[in-house]
């Protein structure tokens, strides 16, 4: 198992522009760092579905059924479109910190889970790229898959948390600037 190669690929994938990182930035700018981190926790929880699917061989079944895979891609695209339209039409609000509102936190967390599960970039990574890092010829690859899945979740949460903190800090600086 090439752990450092996997970590490098995982970090690059996580930093690559896409809906997950864009929504972490959006939540952090509009609602604060805490909201971005709650959303990031949801995204990382959604990764459990991908790791489980790969570990149990469900991904092989999905890839062998073009209809099922296409339906999943369309569901993901439709959900991302829905979120984009909803964000575009949303009333512009001033920057505020998520103040322990459990309903808002729960909604952001659930949105993160669903968004990650339906994200085509993450699906393709776990279907096509992830298995390349599993040692060939081992009798039971499941523990190795679970370990790599855990590593992926941890690095993703760390990166999303840093992105949330930076986006929040930039938003606060811009809001304090009288010229903005």
Predicted segments, located by residue:
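Alpha-helical transmembrane segments and their lipid-water interface positions
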Residues: 46-58, 80-86, 115, 123, ...
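Multi-pass membrane proteins that catalyze or facilitate reactions on polyprenyl-/lipid-phosphate substrates
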Residues: 88, 127-140, 162-169
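Anionic-ligand binding region
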Residues: 101-114, 119
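Flexible cytoplasmic inter-helical loops of multi-pass small-molecule transporters
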Residues: 89-105
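Selective transmembrane alpha-helices of multi-pass membrane proteins
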Residues: 64-92, 156-163, 171-180
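Juxtamembrane transmembrane-helix termini in multi-pass membrane transport proteins
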Residues: 1-70, 128-148
């Amino acid at each position: 198992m090439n752990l450092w190669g996997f970590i490098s690929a995982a970090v690059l994938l996580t930093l690559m522009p896409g809906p997950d990182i864009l929504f972490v930035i959006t939540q952090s700018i509009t609602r604060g760092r805490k909201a971005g981190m709650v959303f990031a926790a949801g995204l990382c929880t959604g990764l459990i579905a991908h790791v489980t699917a790969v570990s149990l061989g469900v991904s092989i079944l999905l890839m062998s059924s073009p209809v099922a895979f296409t339906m999943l891609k369309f569901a993901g695209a439709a959900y991302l479109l829905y979120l984009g339209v909803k964000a575009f039409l949303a009333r512009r609000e001033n920057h505020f910190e998520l103040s322990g509102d459990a309903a808002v936190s729960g909604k952001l967390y659930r949105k993160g889970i669903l968004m990650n599960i339906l994200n085509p970039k993450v699906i393709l990574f776990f279907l096509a790229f992830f298995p390349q890092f599993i040692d060939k010829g081992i009798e039971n690859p499941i523990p190795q898959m679970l370990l790599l899945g855990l590593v992926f979740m941890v690095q993703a949460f760390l990166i999303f948390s840093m992105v949330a903190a930076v986006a929040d800090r930039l938003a606060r600086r811009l809001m304090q600037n009288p010229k903005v």
